[in-house]
Amino acid sequence: MNNPNKPLMLVLSSPSGAGKTTLSKKIQQSDNSFEISVSHTTRKPRANEVDGLDYHFVSKEKFKTLLKENAFYEHAEIFGNYYGTSKSSINKITKNNHNVLFDIDWQGSEQLSRFKELNLVKVFILPPSKEELEKRLIARNQDDKEAIKRRMLAYSKDIVHQKDYDYVLVNDNVENCFNNIKGIILKHLKRI
């Protein structure tokens, strides 16, 4: 259960392309008490991504070393790349009494849930439909046809995990979905 005396840890998860990263950025821009957890990854940076801001881009060898050192709260292999949230980055955020915003998949959320000391509120974001998700993936122009096909195959496996979340929202309109998330934040922070 949520503890209003500890920093809130808001988890946003969704199938790839449903809008969790866009929503995460909107939350951070609208509420400076939130800091986005910057994950480590072994994938190559996309255009306009900045190391240390969007992700900590590391080699597979470095990632495996961090795993052996038990440096992560959560980690997963997704589409052949590793992702993980380091304990040190979360501790740095909460030390400043800021709330933490996680932009992670269901596997990461499941692993975070094992740490009872974390003040988690979990929100699963759905696209309006599978067809709309495919349109979004094509429109964002970040993946080739094969990658989009893999993401669409993963969609059905991803959405079964929505039952493990505190809230499930449909992102049919970014502003409406964002306002719903703000309502959830207000409820759990008891801010007006």
Mark where each language-model region is.
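Pre-Walker A (Motif I) flank of P-loop NTPase domains
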Residues: 5-10
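Walker A/P-loop
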Residues: 21
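NTP-dependent small-molecule kinase module
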Residues: 2-4, 135, 139-143, 157-192
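ATP-dependent small-molecule kinase phosphotransfer cores
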Residues: 41-100, 106-110
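A glycine- and Lys/Arg-enriched "phosphate-lid" helix/loop adjacent to the NTP-binding pocket
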Residues: 43-48, 71, 94-99, 104-106, ...
